[in-house]
């Protein structure tokens, strides 16, 4: 397994697919990286030379990925919560942030149902 940005990427897959195992790199970014590095999209990771891996690492070093990206996202959410914006309040309450209906659905964000017992009559 080759290590890129602190992540072991699978050897048997194509380079484009393997790069998506790094947090912050999707298909489009992966394709841009290998084009800039001058590597064929059909190349498998096991066929890469150390020179090609080095070029990929140099390009990825210029992109914010893994820990830095996760830290930035969490700081952005924390900032929204501190300034008291509507989005920050939704994050704090564990509700959907982007305007989705939460009366019936939103179970992923709200968690399992907490049933309330009926009063005795």
UniProtKB/Swiss-Prot annotation:
Q: Name one GO biological process term.
A: translation
An example of a Pfam family matching this protein is Ribosomal_S13
Kindly give the InterPro entries that the UniProt entry links to this protein: Rbsml_uS13_C, Ribosomal_uS13, Ribosomal_uS13-like_H2TH, Ribosomal_uS13_bac-type, Ribosomal_uS13_CS
This protein's superkingdom?
Answer: Bacteria
Region Disordered, as annotated, extends over 91-121
Which of UniProt's keywords are assigned here?
Ribonucleoprotein, Ribosomal protein, RNA-binding, rRNA-binding, tRNA-binding
This entry's Gene Ontology molecular function terms read: rRNA binding; structural constituent of ribosome; tRNA binding
> Which residue intervals are annotated with compositional bias (Basic residues) in the record?
106-121
Question: Could you give one GO CC term from the UniProt record?
Answer: cytosol
Oligomeric state and interaction partners are given as:
Part of the 30S ribosomal subunit. Forms a loose heterodimer with protein S19. Forms two bridges to the 50S subunit in the 70S ribosome.
| Role | Located at the top of the head of the 30S subunit, it contacts several helices of the 16S rRNA. In the 70S ribosome it contacts the 23S rRNA (bridge B1a) and protein L5 of the 50S subunit (bridge B1b), connecting the 2 subunits; these bridges are implicated in subunit movement. Contacts the tRNAs in the A and P-sites.
Q: Which HAMAP family match?
A: Ribosomal_uS13
Say which family it is in. Answer: Belongs to the universal ribosomal protein uS13 family.
How is this protein named in the record? Answer: Small ribosomal subunit protein uS13
* Record organism: Bacillus mycoides (strain KBAB4)
